[in-house]
C-alpha cells in the first residue's frame, strides 16, 4: 500500500465502534495541506443531556502537513463540543484512499454543499452519510449495493396472490459500519493510527 501522503488522497476518520461513534474526513486543499471536514449533527437534548455533536459544522478547519500530523495534533482531542480549539472527538484511526486532485475538489465541493444546503437527519443525512455521499460523487465506492428478490407466497384466505418483492441494501448510517464498508470497497487504501 504505497500511498503518497504528499500527493492526492483523502483520509476517512473513524471514532468508536460501540456506543459513541463518529465519522469525518480530511481533504487536501490546493496547497497540498490536509483540512478537517465534519457534519456535527444538531446537538439536541435527549434523555437529560445534549447529544449529536456540535451546534455547527467544521468546514476546512486547519492545515496539516499529513493525516498523521492531524491525528497527533492538539486539535484532534476529545472534549467539550463548544471548544473551538479541538474537534471534540479525538480520532485514533483513519483510512487513506488515493484520489486525484479532481476527485479531491469534487469531494470538498460536495461535502460543503451538503453541509450548507441539507438539514441534519440522523437516518438520512448524518456524519457518516455526508462523507459517503461526498466520496460517491467523486466515483469512490462506499458500500456494495445488493438487491435480493423474495417470493411472497399467496394467501387464498386473505384473497392475495403470490408476488415478488425486491429488497435493496441502502447506504449504512452507522459510522463504524460505513468505515468498514469503505475499507472493504477500497482495498488500495492504508490504515493510519494515532
What are these regions (language model features)?
Residues 81-110:
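A structural motif
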Residues 104-194:
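Activation targets extended, charge/polar-rich intrinsically disordered C-terminal tails
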Residues 62, 99-102, 125:
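Short coil/turn linker and secondary-structure boundary residues
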Residues 1-91, 121:
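Glycine-rich catalytic cores of cysteine/serine-nucleophile enzymes that process amide/ester linkages
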Residues 67, 74, 79, 98, ...:
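Proline-rich intrinsically disordered, low-complexity coils
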Amino acid at each position: 500500500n504505497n500511498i503518497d501522503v504528499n500527493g492526492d488522497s483523502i483520509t476517512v476518520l473513524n471514532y468508536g465502534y460501540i456506543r459513541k461513534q463518529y465519522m469525518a474526513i480530511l481533504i487536501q486543499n490546493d496547497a497540498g495541506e490536509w483540512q478537517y471536514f465534519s457534519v456535527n449533527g444538531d446537538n439536541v437534548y435527549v434523555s437529560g443531556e445534549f447529544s449529536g455533536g456540535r451546534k455547527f459544522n467544521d468546514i476546512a478547519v486547519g492545515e496539516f502537513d499529513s493525516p498523521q500530523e492531524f491525528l497527533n495534533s492538539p486539535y484532534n482531542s476529545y472534549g467539550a463540543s463548544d471548544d473551538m480549539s479541538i474537534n471534540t472527538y479525538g480520532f485514533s484511526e483513519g483510512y487513506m484512499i488515493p484520489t486525484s486532485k479532481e476527485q479531491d475538489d469534487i469531494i470538498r465541493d460536495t461535502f460543503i454543499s451538503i453541509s450548507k444546503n441539507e438539514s441534519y437527519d440522523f437516518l438520512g443525512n448524518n456524519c457518516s452519510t455526508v462523507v459517503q455521499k461526498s466520496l460517491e460523487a467523486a466515483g469512490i465506492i462506499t458500500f456494495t449495493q445488493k438487491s435480493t428478490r423474495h417470493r411472497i407466497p399467496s394467501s387464498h384466505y386473505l384473497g392475495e396472490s403470490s408476488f415478488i418483492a425486491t429488497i435493496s441494501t441502502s447506504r449504512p448510517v452507522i459510522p463504524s459500519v460505513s468505515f468498514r464498508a469503505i475499507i472493504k470497497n477500497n482495498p488500495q487504501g492504508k490504515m493510519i493510527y494515532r
